[in-house]
């Protein structure tokens, strides 16, 4: 563990929160950034850019077609001194274009780290010019475990897998668990076959099935969105989970990756039902019994699965508590940040250890039957 001089940041976080707006897929990224600021000596740099401008559009279209990467309108980093770590999270390969505008990030940091969220193997070729920008970083981390090898081969740089995480404290239903008044909660992509079956089941049994009824990618406020999501899942008995882009094989091909929903469901103590990803990383991260109760995508038998689970209250309680404990002890953002620091050759600060102590105390409460 390291100590840090008061007022002197050792980490500079480049955040796109003023560029991407409050897109829902960005909310977990901002959650991670905010926790880093709480547990480390970090400074947040969040420049603005007009993504609808001609300049931004032209730079993006050009990078799709040529190896020329122009600044899309990002103001460069001013003289801020020197940091131990420069850290950024990119949602998609196109976001890497921002670092044509802040090319001096290597000059002001000992180690530069980029965490890339969504990158499918099938999309590597068309995004190759964007991905070349990753060659500027010292450390490249990926949320998609199966993309690590092909991306490493493209940029001739070792990439590593970093699993998604969760604010396990905010999502934790303990020490004061509330009544789970929502029977089934489904958010995001869904099977229409399973959805129609759940609608029928809810009508016939007068159960509460909560699901999306509008389309759109923007939240009003990212923090409020995450807080509301945590509140809803904590009040849900069953939470539907499936691998990323499960309904879009044209983009993902045969690739199977772990989405945020698995971490959210476990942390909030909901019983997760859906597809168990055929992914080696998943078997390491969610290896405990009943982590996910399998319901095949497009299944019309989900009502029978729920009926079987409802017949065994002791099993239900065990599933809930185990998921919460696992999230608190393994999947909180503090553990992900420790992995980032390790890649940069740094130790966590005291605030990180204090958060881990709090997580362990909550885990002790959750484990008590």
Task: List each model region and its residues.
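Active-site/pore-lining binding-face segments in mid-to-C-terminal subdomains
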Residues: 257, 287, 296-297, 320, ...
